[in-house]
UniProtKB/Swiss-Prot annotation:
Note in the entry: In plastids the F-type ATPase is also known as CF(1)CF(0).
Protein name (record): ATP synthase subunit b, chloroplastic
UniProt record similarity statement: Belongs to the ATPase B chain family.
Main location: plastid
Length: 185
């Protein structure tokens, strides 16, 4: 490579014969000179350009690999999230179903408790009514007994005199004697 570079340098120092040589003025150059310059640039710049392209290629390749790994990780996370979501949805449905069952059970329990309370209130009312009826009946009996006793005492005071009283005493004494002796009247 050094040999080619040296030969090109020597070509630039050759005395011009009038028609051949390197023109270093870019505006006065011709196609051959531009081709030669480009060829030299391509030949010597090929390694640098190749290295740059290889570096860029390896960076792109590693970026693609990283992206693919991240994509795989994201897919894996997405699958996990979907499975978790499905599990949570099943759990929510289960909780919802259990909630409805529990609500129905509590509703039935409340209806049952209300029915029991209503029956207890009805029984208590019936007992109270029965007790009050018995109390009224007892009060009426007491009043009737008291009034009958009052009438009997009044009758006794009015009807009984001493003579009737003595006769009654004698009669009862006679009965007691007869009992003692074994004779009954």
């Amino acid at each position: 490579m050094k040999g080619i570079a040296n030969s090109l340098i020597y070509l630039s120092y050759w005395p011009s014969a009038g028609s051949f040589g390197f023109n270093t003025n870019i505006l006065e150059t011709n196609i051959i000179n531009i081709t030669v310059v480009l060829g030299i640039l391509i030949y010597f710049g090929k390694g640098v350009l190749s290295n740059l392209l290889d570096n860029r290629k390896s960076k792109i390749y590693s970026t693609i690999q990283n992206s693919e790994e991240l994509c795989k990780g994201a897919r894996h996370q997405l699958e996990k999230a979907r499975a978790r979501l499905q599990e949570i949805e099943m759990r929510v449905d289960e909780i919802r179903a259990n909630g409805y069952l529990q609500i129905e059970q509590e509703k039935e329990d409340l209806v049952q408790a209300a029915s029991v309370n209503l029956k207890q209130l009805e029984d208590s009312k019936n007992e109270t009514v029965s007790f009050e009826q018995q109390k009224v009946i007892d009060q009426v009996r007491q009043q009737v007994s008291y009034q009958a006793l009052q009438k009997a005492l009044t009758f006794m005071k009015n009807c009984l005199n001493t003579e009737l009283h003595l006769r009654m005493i004698n009669y009862n004494i006679g009965r007691l004697r007869a009992k003692r002796t074994g004779q009954f009247l």
